[in-house]
């Protein structure tokens, strides 16, 4: 079980949004590299980064900030937001990313994801962002008619490293993870699932470590870490203890 601290990038700064709304952004750190190093120093082993401007623009926008993060931390980093082509993927992996997250392109062009998995084994994750059980695309600005499990099943056996499942209705508002839909997805596919959206307290960490949730690869935490609602040392100690 991995707890992924999140850095969301908007205009070169580390922010959190409420419900995926770019107008509701709180700046938590103007220096993303320093934030990445702080998470590493706290004992986290991975880092989850999203280029928010990129997700809306359909191309990487916060490249300089991502490079600063990669220079600042030794931890593996996964990045999503605006990565829509094989050339994009290759460029970012050459920059030192450990994993690239494909979201909109997974809906628009599933064949590209499958091809990427062949070219870059173990390096491709799929981001599934859902609102009301349906997949959202283009930085959450647009809804599709595609169901979450329906999309996930398209990549069964393709070699996807993980599915990052975000419940947009809970993102950034600290109401707790949508366990029902998250575990339903984890039960439906053999691809490892990472929960995102709504992690609110140490109770969510405890819930994550219960037997039925052990099938999850981990969870992503943003606002709860920044606001001090989850103490990194306590959370990481719980996870470590559960590993036995």
Swiss-Prot record:
BP GO annotations: L-histidine biosynthetic process; L-tryptophan biosynthetic process
Name this protein carries in UniProt: 1-(5-phosphoribosyl)-5-[(5-phosphoribosylamino)methylideneamino] imidazole-4-carboxamide isomerase
Taxonomic lineage of the native organism: Bacteria, Pseudomonadati, Pseudomonadota, Alphaproteobacteria, Hyphomicrobiales
Record-linked InterPro entries: Aldolase_TIM (IPR013785), His_biosynth (IPR006062), HisA_bact_arch (IPR006063), Isoase_HisA-like (IPR044524), Isoase_HisA-like_bact (IPR023016), RibuloseP-bd_barrel (IPR011060)
The family this protein is said to belong to: Belongs to the HisA/HisF family.
Pathway assignment: Amino-acid biosynthesis; L-histidine biosynthesis; L-histidine from 5-phospho-alpha-D-ribose 1-diphosphate: step 4/9
EC number(s) stated in the UniProt entry for this protein: 5.3.1.16
HAMAP family per the UniProt record, alphabetical: HisA (MF_01014)
One matching Pfam family: His_biosynth
Cellular compartment(s): Cytoplasm
Annotated source species: Allorhizobium ampelinum (strain ATCC BAA-846 / DSM 112012 / S4) (Agrobacterium vitis (strain S4))
Annotated catalytic residues: 8 (proton acceptor), 129 (proton donor)
Major localisation: cytoplasm
Alphabetically ordered keywords of this record: Amino-acid biosynthesis, Cytoplasm, Histidine biosynthesis, Isomerase
Recorded GO MF terms: 1-(5-phosphoribosyl)-5-[(5-phosphoribosylamino)methylideneamino]imidazole-4-carboxamide isomerase activity
């Amino acid at each position: 079980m991995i707890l992924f601290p999140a850095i969301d990038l908007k205009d070169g700064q580390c922010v959190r949004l409420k419900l995926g709304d770019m107008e509701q952004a709180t700046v938590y750190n103007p220096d993303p590299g320093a934030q990445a190093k702080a998470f590493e120093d706290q004992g986290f082993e991975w880092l989850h980064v999203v280029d928010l401007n990129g997700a809306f623009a359909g191309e990487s926008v916060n490249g300089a900030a991502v490079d600063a993060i990669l220079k600042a931390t030794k931890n593996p980093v996964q990045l999503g937001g605006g990565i829509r082509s094989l050339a994009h993927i290759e460029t970012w992996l050459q920059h030192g990313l450990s994993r690239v997250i494909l979201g909109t392109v997974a809906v628009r062009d599933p064949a590209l994801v499958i091809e990427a998995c062949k070219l870059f084994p173990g390096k491709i994750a799929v981001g599934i962002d859902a609102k009301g059980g349906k997949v959202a695309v283009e930085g959450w600005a647009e809804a599709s008619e595609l169901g979450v499990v329906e999309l996930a099943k398209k990549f069964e056996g393709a070699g996807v490293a993980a599915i990052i499942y975000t419940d947009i209705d809970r993102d950034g508002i600290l109401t707790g993870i949508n366990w029902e839909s998250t575990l339903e997805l984890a039960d439906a596919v053999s691809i490892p699932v990472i929960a995102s959206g709504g992690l609110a307290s140490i109770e969510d960490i405890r819930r994550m470590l219960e037997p039925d949730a052990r099938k999850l690869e981990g969870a992503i935490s943003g606002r709860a870490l920044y606001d001090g609602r989850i103490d990194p040392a306590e959370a990481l100690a719980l996870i470590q203890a559960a590993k036995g």
